[in-house]
Amino acid sequence: MSAERKPERSFWRTIDVSLSANDLRKKTMSKGILGRKVGMTQIFEQDGRAIPVTVIEAGPCHVLQIKTVDRDGYEAMQLGFADKPRRLVGRAGRGHVASISSKRSSKLKAAGGSLGTKPECEPKRFVREFRGAATAEVGSEIKVSVLDGVKSVDVTGTSKGCGFSGWMKRHNYAGQRATHGVKKVHRHAGGTSAGTYPGRVRKGKKGAGHYGVDRVTMRNMKVVRVDTENNLLLVHGAVPGPTGGFVIIRETNKVG
């Protein structure tokens, strides 16, 4: 007689779903700020060694919105960086950062409700969220001094666009031989699939195409200097993106 088969263990039984909203709020947010890449330079240490650094204009940022578990299902703090002229922003964008009169707001006021606290600042060009329990109030200003004492950061930016590139530049392939029968196809891809089966190029095959304009994160970058007077942050090494590109800076959670 065959033994009875044990029921498979459900994956969801291993997850503790009994956490309340108060328990979730206890998760603190990692330090972070928005900025703009200024460029690269080098500084000299006391022993004479030259260190390549990237200069980032970090802040000041305004807290535009606070996301809560009760209302939004998760906790986050929305930051905005770099003012944008109001004439270039739609009514929804202007109403996100400042109180403006509308039919909806009038009805809410008549019913005794409110649209919540507004930061009362200029619209922002670069807006991003930082997950976790908020450490500031709506409308407050976040400066580069928030990174004082931080040794390493993760910098996220958008890589430079290279247009339509070949497979050698895009995927770092070696190409074909320079001599011995190779003619006019030195930088070509060569064979991409078999003829009889599968008789086609499989999906996901590396080849030529659009290269760049990707979200890239450089992790565990050493903080060389924090200039609170000029809102500048100097990190060791190169940061993804062109000069003037927006970046996200977070305190790294990588060990070692």
What is each PLM-predicted segment?
Residues 5-9, 13:
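Cationic, low-complexity basic patches in intrinsically disordered or flexible, solvent-exposed regions
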